Amino acid sequence: MTMESGADNQQSGDAAVTEAENQQMTVQAQPQIATLAQVSMPAAHATSSAPTVTLVQLPNGQTVQVHGVIQAAQPSVIQSPQVQTVQISTIAESEDSQESVDSVTDSQKRREILSRRPSYRKILNDLSSDAPGVPRIEEEKSEEETSAPAITTVTVPTPIYQTSSGQYIAITQGGAIQLANNGTDGVQGLQTLTMTNAAATQPGTTILQYAQTTDGQQILVPSNQVVVQAASGDVQTYQIRTAPTSTIAPGVVMASSPALPTQPAEEAARKREVRLMKNREAARECRRKKKEYVKCLENRVAVLENQNKTLIEELKALKDLYCHKSD
């Protein structure tokens, strides 16, 4: 037992000495490793494909070549795809922008056209107003109109119109209409109708004018018609038409016979057309029913004829039978 314990003590002492020496060697190796790290350098003949060779100088002066464990990175076999930058043009946005530009230009053109045109509401208000003055339509004057020379004033003779009843109608430049009978004195039988808005217009246009009678009543009539109020209070409309210059002297225009207002005439014509259409439909229906009735009668006659034939044959047979029995 004593020998075993002594051996154990010796082993433990040796282990302690060994540990102390290892610690001392480790402490001494640290500056040596630092020295080696300072002295070490890569081999000059090392290439990228061969492993790196490092020269290590020991403390005793010996030099040792150490191959590096860390190898240089080899080029990868997998190649990364080439990235190409593609510029995509947005067609939809360009079309939208083009449409927006077109809409802006269209709206500008429409605004310019509306600014050039006269105000239709203003014209309607002027026509519906009771003011005897001539309405004015303000329009933008073009450069050609502003640069046009001065217009000379020409005096036009007063036109005289004669109706089929013998009345004379004179229209002055101010828009007044004077009426005179053929058999009466010119001063006593003179009637004046004041027409507003009697300005000259372009041919082919229809202008409604106000005709003022002697009692102060205003009537809206077309520019080519004349309204005449008789002594009894009846108002008649005369439509003026220009006759050929070969038959009548210039300045004299014949007027047609008094015409009914257009609206009642159109209403009467429409009613007449409706009545005629209904009559045609009724006559067509009557003819159809008549044909059906005649056909039915013909069928009945044919049936009765067949029955009559059968009865005649039966009568003959009975007569023959009676004759045979009597014999």
From Swiss-Prot:
There is a cross-link at residue 122 (Glycyl lysine isopeptide (Lys-Gly) (interchain with G-Cter in SUMO2)). One of its GO terms (cellular component) is euchromatin. Disulfide bonds: none annotated. It is found in: Nucleus. Expressed in the heart (at protein level). Keywords: Activator, Biological rhythms, Differentiation, DNA-binding, Isopeptide bond, Nucleus, Phosphoprotein, Transcription, Transcription regulation, Ubl conjugation. The modification Phosphoserine is found at residues 119, 128, 257. Residues 87-146 form the KID domain. It comes from the Eukaryota. Changing residue 119 to A: Loss of phosphorylation by RPS6KA4 and RPS6KA5. There is a cross-link at residues 271, 290 (Glycyl lysine isopeptide (Lys-Gly) (interchain with G-Cter in SUMO1)). Residues 269-327 form the bZIP domain. Residues 1-27, 94-113, 126-151 are annotated as: Disordered. The record marks 300 as: Required for binding TORCs. Phosphorylation-dependent transcription factor that stimulates transcription upon binding to the DNA cAMP response element (CRE), a sequence present in many viral and cellular promoters. Transcription activation is enhanced by the TORC coactivators which act independently of Ser-119 phosphorylation. Involved in different cellular processes including the synchronization of circadian rhythmicity and the differentiation of adipose cells. Regulates the expression of apoptotic and inflammatory response factors in cardiomyocytes in response to ERFE-mediated activation of AKT signaling. Interacts with PPRC1. Binds DNA as a dimer. This dimer is stabilized by magnesium ions. Interacts, through the bZIP domain, with the coactivators CRTC1/TORC1, CRTC2/TORC2 and CRTC3/TORC3. Interacts (phosphorylated form) with TOX3. When phosphorylated on Ser-119, binds CREBBP. Interacts with ARRB1. Binds to HIPK2. Interacts with SGK1. Interacts with CREBL2; regulates CREB1 phosphorylation, stability and transcriptional activity. Interacts with TSSK4; this interaction facilitates phosphorylation on Ser-119. Forms a complex with KMT2A and CREBBP. This is Cyclic AMP-responsive element-binding protein 1.
